Amino acid sequence: MTLAARPPFEEPLGRGRARLLPWATVMVGSLVTILPWSATLPLLPPAGLLILLSWRLLAPLSLRVWAPALLGLFDDLLSGQPLGSAMLLWTLAFFLVEAIDARSGVRDFKQSWAIAAIAIGFVLVGGRLVATPLDAHVDSVLLLQIVISVLLFPAAARLVAWIDLRRAL
């Protein structure tokens, strides 16, 4: 919907609500982990992380630099991971994306996807090191979860792009 196609009396999204929308979508993504899924292997991708990375890569100014710490705390409280693990890992991933973004300048979606793949792999491997003993044999399942998460990133990015378009109108 373009600005010309908007109905004449439709109110635009308020400034406070427009700033709250990225936070709310990441929190809703983190809420996916509490849904009753029937699975024998933990292959559910971290939807909150995917949406957080999508917001950072598609609309860099939508979230502040300190936002991953609070959103990671929310995710830790819901997912059952050790408290502070997502806070630390999401913040470090956000800084990693910031550093790569500062060095690369202009990028296309394939490069954003590669940056997200690096960040997703970093967070999931870091979460495995924090949450499970080193002698636990979960590496093949973790690799499969990383692959699924990286393959689902374009869907999360498309959702965030659609939400950001609606937020702008």
Q: What feature does the model see in each segment?
A:
Residues 1-169:
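Terminal, non-globular segments
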